[in-house]
């Protein structure tokens, strides 16, 4: 997993995590499950670390449903699914840990419509958005995220 994050961060640094480079399609999707490429003609396997870490390029904008996962691509805005160690729950409690944009984060506040997280150990925020909310391994909604004054704001979408 550490190697995977290093490769991903390196990729972000070299491409700027944007759609400006000619060889970078609309979105980079990282999934924790195998995607049947034959079902999605616009999915191109970028690299595969193991059975749990796979990166895909999507050559068109749009949202794609695959089992419990929702994968979105919109001009460099990415959806991500996470490993089983830290995942969003249906209602993350203040003080609990979640995985956000591939990094461990602590929930610092929670309300009916949003919750805020702070990254642990000063790890960098990679700018990913459209994160899945999972409860016991099942995706129950999407979280859209943005940054205000250095804090990551997460809006719940059920």
What name fits each language-model region?
Residues 3-12:
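Bacterial N-terminal signal peptides
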Residues 17-62, 134, 138-140, 144-158:
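Catalytic histidine site
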Residues 18-19, 76-84, 99-158:
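Active-site region of chymotrypsin-like
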Residues 32-36, 58-62, 81-87, 118-125:
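Secondary-structure transition/turn motif
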Residues 46-48, 67-73, 107:
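Short amphipathic beta-strand and strand-loop transition segments with alternating hydrophobic
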Residues 57, 63-74, 78-82:
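Hydrophobic, well-structured mid-protein blocks that either form specific transmembrane helices
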Residues 91-99:
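Short coil-to-beta transition motif at edge beta-strands of beta-rich domains
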């Amino acid at each position: 997993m550490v190697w995977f994050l290093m490769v991903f961060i390196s990729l972000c640094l070299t491409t700027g995590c944007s759609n400006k480079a000619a060889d970078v399609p609309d979105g980079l999707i990282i999934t924790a499950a195998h995607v049947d490429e034959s079902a999605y003609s616009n999915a191109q396997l970028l690299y595969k670390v193991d059975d749990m870490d796979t990166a895909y390029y999507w050559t068109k904008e749009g949202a794609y449903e695959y089992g419990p996962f929702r994968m979105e691509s919109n001009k460099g805005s990415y959806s991500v699914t996470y490993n089983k160690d830290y995942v969003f729950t249906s209602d993350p409690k203040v003080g609990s840990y979640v995985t956000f944009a591939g990094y461990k984060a602590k929930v610092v506040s929670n309300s009916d419509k949003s919750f805020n997280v702070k990254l642990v150990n000063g790890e960098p925020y990679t700018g990913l958005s459209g994160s899945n909310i999972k409860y016991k391994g099942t995706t129950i909604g999407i979280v859209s995220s943005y940054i205000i004054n250095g804090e990551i704001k997460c809006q719940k979408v059920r």
